[in-house]
């Protein structure tokens, strides 16, 4: 049977130019890593000047239907008959919270939320937990103002972030507490310190009933250098690590003992710490600027830390232009 995925309108304009190709690559990765290669003959097509990604698949089961509904680019999903007629299918979204959680924040340097969702999905697909619908523990060790944390919460996962920039910590803390209040969600927020580092713990209930029953989503944000993860969290605490590495600017405070300025130095020193925090069967997904760090070098760093690097034509097809100085790509490593 033939299907068609309507690609979501994307902003900024530069990302929109790559959206169909990125959607096709994401679909192929999910097919290979989660669905046993069930999706074939993937093509980018236009119907009436509107971009779609089409593919062939058996009748959709629950797993494939849910994954297709939650691809980063999915705006609508259709079956496609031999006459070219499109029949809409219900979307089975994983979202547990309102979508403005990931879209409402606007600030310079924010990663496009569609790409954040794509990176999250590809990392989840590589893990041993891709077929499970349960709350996972997700870490962003360079979390900025929390785009990845918000995506994790959207999907019903527990989110943990570490960020050295105190202004980002303060901005996220204000945002998330204001957001849950505006949505009238039952929650509890506690601000304190851990190992001398400022920390926010927030637990929220998707519904009042779930909150009363103790069924909450948790977000933890620690204002610290990423290397402090080893002292703040126990080993094997996280199912997924998803992060957007710095694109060539300093991520860290001044001083010999703090994070190195160059992305390659940062990742080389931080990856052993991140790897130790990852549970067996988990996965690490990293987005980075491949104009400042070659893919081969980053793959080598992942492999040296005991991770199986995901390599396929689809996995190697996520590179896209952000601006003149940034060509963003992603890479994923699996933990045995």
Tell where the protein language model's regions lie, with residue ranges:
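Class I S-adenosyl-L-methionine-dependent methyltransferase catalytic core
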Residues: 1-26, 62-63, 71, 80-139, ...
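N-terminal accessory interaction module
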Residues: 21-88
